Structure formats: structure tokens, C-alpha cells
From Swiss-Prot:
CDD domains: OTUB1. It is an enzyme of class 3 (hydrolase). Its EC number is 3.4.19.12. This is Ubiquitin thioesterase otubain-like. InterPro entries: OTU_dom, Otubain, Papain-like_cys_pep_sf, Peptidase_C65_otubain, Peptidase_C65_otubain_sub1, Peptidase_C65_otubain_sub2.
Length: 262
């Protein structure tokens, strides 16, 4: 093995700085959650690519709009939260059920061993966000929808929601550790996986995150996979299997955005 040199250190610093510059450019130019956009905007991203063009065409038979999320590793949790709250704005009884579940979630996490002082601020902010998008709030649906969009583009609120959903996901993995251990490749324990891949911000999500969160909150999600797979059609997967989806997401390698059915 060649000895470490000063140049190696400089190169590492340069790589780290380049990564920071890219992250800053993304945060400066990309909103946390975009406005609704026509699904056809995807064509421009894959111009000249026959496989993706055919799949976007297939997708457009089922969906009319897309809402982008910032590609920062938190996209699944942010997209999930925005889309589910958007659904709840129009469904008062489902909203009340979710609000009750959210209120009780902190105590459940404490019983699972999460320190109460760690949860306090995140849970408080989570409940504030839920209250601010209540279907009963003054101004009607469009006013509440505007409030939801405003909240999710305020970094503090938006990130606190993501953190709390990560904690709920981690709690579900701990609660049903024997079941979820089957989804983890390699020698990682559930505890190590939770601390390394679930609780930290900016860590990307996989099927295990989706299943755990959907199960914890009783919310069905349909994910449409836009990839290079054969067939010319987009494959969909419902989480949990057999559930009725309330949230529709599109997955492209490493990233989730929100979809709106026709």
C-alpha cells in the first residue's frame, strides 16, 4: 500500500468541497416541493430516449400531474408527508383518525425506548403542521392547500416533519424487528440499520422504509417505477401489498416525486 501523501489529503478536501457545492446549488435552485406540473414535463428530461419516452407515454394514461421534491435523500419522506396531508385535507374523517394516531405516536415511541426529550420538539412541530392543514380551518380547501405548500417549503418545518417520520419508521422497525430483519442484507442488525440508514437525515429510502412507515400510519402507497426495465410499461407496487393507495409516487433511480391520478 502506498503511503498517504499531502496530495491525498488535498484531493479528499477537494472532493468534499465539490459535493458541498453541488448540494448548495441544488438547495439554491430546487424548491423542497414544487408546484404541480404537467406529467408531460418528463419528456424533456428523456428527449431521444425511446425506452423512457414509451414509459412516460404509458404513465400519462393514468396520471396527469407530477409534483417534484428536492433530491436530497429525504425525498421519499417529504413526498409521503406532503401527499398524505394533501389527501387528508379533503377527507375529514381520515384526517381526524390520523391526527389521533399522530398525537399518540410520541408516547408509543417513548414506550419503545426513545428518549422523551429527543422527541419533544419534533412531535410538537409535527402536530402543529397537522393542525395548520386541518380541513376545518377557515378559508376552505384552497387556503389550506396553500398553507400546506408554504409549510413544506419552509426548511425548518419541512425537515422537522421528515425527522419525525424517520423516527416513526425506526420505531416500527424496532417494534417488529424479527419481521423486518428479513429485509436487511448482510450482517447488519435491525438496531444498527435503524441508526445508520433510517434515523439520519439525507439517507435514501428503500422498500423497508416504505413498508414500515405505511404500516405504522395505516396509509397505502402506490409507487410507479420509471426505469429501463423491459416491456414499455411502468410497473407499479402497492405498499403494504393489497392496500388501497392514498398516496401516489413515482420512483426513478434514487429519487421519489408525487403523482396525481387522472
Amino acid at each position: 500500500m502506498e503511503p498517504f501523501t499531502h496530495n491525498d489529503g488535498n484531493r479528499d478536501e477537494l472532493i468534499i468541497q465539490q459535493k458541498r457545492d453541488i448540494e448548495k446549488e441544488i438547495s439554491d435552485t430546487t424548491p423542497l416541493v414544487s408546484e404541480q406540473l404537467p406529467l408531460t414535463c418528463l419528456y424533456a428530461e428523456y428527449s431521444g430516449d425511446e425506452i423512457f419516452t414509451a414509459k412516460i407515454q404509458d404513465l400519462s394514461k393514468k396520471y396527469k400531474f407530477i409534483r417534484r421534491t428536492r433530491p436530497d435523500g429525504n425525498c421519499f419522506f417529504r413526498a409521503f408527508a406532503y401527499s398524505y396531508l394533501e389527501y387528508l385535507i379533503s377527507n375529514t374523517s381520515a384526517y381526524q383518525e390520523f391526527k389521533k394516531l399522530a398525537e399518540e405516536s410520541k408516547e408509543k415511541l417513548v414506550q419503545l425506548g426513545f428518549p422523551s426529550f429527543t422527541l419533544e420538539d419534533f412531535h410538537e412541530t409535527f402536530m402543529e403542521v397537522i393542525q395548520r392543514v386541518s380541513p376545518d380551518n377557515a378559508g376552505g380547501h384552497s387556503t389550506v392547500q396553500d398553507e400546506l405548500h408554504k409549510i413544506f417549503n419552509e426548511q425548518g418545518y419541512s425537515d422537522y416533519v421528515v425527522v419525525y417520520l424517520r423516527l416513526i419508521t425506526s420505531g416500527k422497525l424496532q417494534e417488529e424487528a424479527d419481521f423486518y430483519q428479513n429485509f436487511i442484507e448482510g450482517d447488519l442488525t435491525i438496531e444498527a440499520f435503524r441508526h445508520l440508514e433510517v434515523e439520519p437525515m439525507y439517507k435514501e429510502s428503500d422498500h423497508i422504509h416504505i413498508i414500515a412507515l405505511c404500516t405504522a400510519l395505516g396509509a397505502g402507497v402506490r409507487v410507479e417505477y420509471l426505469d429501463r426495465g423491459e416491456g414499455g410499461t411502468v410497473k407499479a407496487h402497492d405498499f403494504p401489498e393489497g392496500s388501497e393507495p392514498r398516496i401516489y409516487l413515482i420512483y426513478r433511480p434514487g429519487h421519489y416525486d408525487i403523482l396525481y391520478p387522472n
